[in-house]
Amino acid sequence: MSNTQNPNIQCSFCGKSQDDVKKMIAGSDVYICNECIELSTRILEEELKEEQDSEMLEVKTPKEMFDHLNEYVIGQEKAKRALAVAVYNHYKRINFTASKIAEDIELQKSNILLIGPTGSGKTFLAQTLAKSLNVPFAIADATSLTEAGYVGEDVENILLKLLQASDFNIERAERGIIYIDEIDKIAKKSENVSITRDVSGEGVQQALLKIIEGTVASVPPQGGRKHPNQEMIQIDTKNILFIVGGAFDGIEEIVKQRLGEKIIGFGANNKKLSDEDSYMQEIIAEDIQKFGLIPEFIGRLPIVAALERLTEEDLIQILTEPKNALIKQYKQLLLFDNVELEFKDGALMAIAKKAIERKTGARGLRSIIEEVMMDIMFEVPSHEEITKVIITEAVVDGKAEPEMIREADKK
């Protein structure tokens, strides 16, 4: 192409002559003026910006995420703060990469390890965050996973669950969140090694390492084991946030030993619950390694948040206060039948006590309420005269029948 000075030549795009513009560029039987070039450049720049903006995720601030978690999750203030900051930084990192600003700086992703007893809210925290961010979310159980060559589930099947949660939209899946539960159950052990199933744990940790740190994985769309000539879906895990959780029963003893506070003999059972929780807050990478996770695996989980054991008061709040509180749900279910449901304070305390006795935490609350409500929910729809049901402590303990108020009783 060259600049031409022939005044009779017109721009092939806007029709302006050489005299009307500053420059006219000639090609093979085609001409373009400087104004059309400038306009084309602006259009291209705007389209490029739109593409970059489409790759950018709208991320809530840590405070906004924390406030959202508070609407659904009772207690666990430290864990909620740690999660909010870690998730914010993770998606900010993705946006930073998409914007191609300061390409010489590589931001590494920060996967998260949640440590806390059963029923303390580990899974629910991750699930609630993913929902608030509108990103695909999948849950996997570490105990079902094995390394290649053993009987069990390939680690790539975790990614299949995320793909399914995103309706096989690969781009969305590659920005999703995966929660792997019971990660403490794959802590390496030296005994009971099987030739058909990897129960030592280390092999599974090694297999998980690659997808957690970031790799392009081949996922069988139908699940199961990989087979030769099988069609695979390629998914890049570098922007998938992995949150792993476990109870890590006994790790507080490892912390006590490190801190030089090991209690020997009869007095070992005299430690208060709050003391156990305080030891959990002191966990460092060294303790997790002694428990059985390999250093390379721990290194891919730089954010560690410890959840506290839920108290009776916490469980009562969980029953009644969050937006999706169980008591609110059951009240609404009976309200559909025009029946008011009331739980006395003693009933709520009894439900919380049962959950603590069963060591199920918040996870076990629904099953306890179901036991109490099953006969009520069976009978009430058949009795239009019932207007109110009252649940007392004795009802929860199985020592009395619920009080049913009928229309005739009010007259």
Curated annotation (Swiss-Prot):
Keywords: ATP-binding, Chaperone, Metal-binding, Nucleotide-binding, Zinc. One of its GO terms (biological process) is cell division. Belongs to the ClpX chaperone family. Residues 1-52 form the ClpX-type ZB domain. This is ATP-dependent Clp protease ATP-binding subunit ClpX. Pfam families: AAA_2, ClpB_D2-small, zf-C4_ClpX. Zn(2+) binds at residues 11, 14, 33, 36. HAMAP family: ClpX.
